[in-house]
């Protein structure tokens, strides 16, 4: 959980993707629910985009656990961005607790197929990294609190002034 929080705050998409891919779908669901309950403005910024949409996936406008025509289980795999789609609803709709994590399914030529390997983890990571600084701090805290085995940690910034004050104090 510390690794996830650190990767969000520092904007390390690849490391965040790898860490998210190792996290259980159940834990991601708990995180998404916490986001939805406490920060609805962030809830509508994750998994509702089109950056993971591929031409062969058709024109999905909504999510479904086992995709059919115009449906997908790929985070940010919509044909067009839709801010009415919420992260907290995405995880429920695609049944992330026991399927579609870290790889989602897409609908191609009359059947649901596995999407991009670790595609859902990659999309969630990108969407989290794209948040503003304050939102990333909030997300880091929620990740630390909701991911199994997580513990709350405080990451402080150290300024040169405090280092100088401490150094001078130590000399006295």
Language-model segments: residues:
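Long non-transmembrane domains of secretory-pathway and surface proteins
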Residues: 1-172
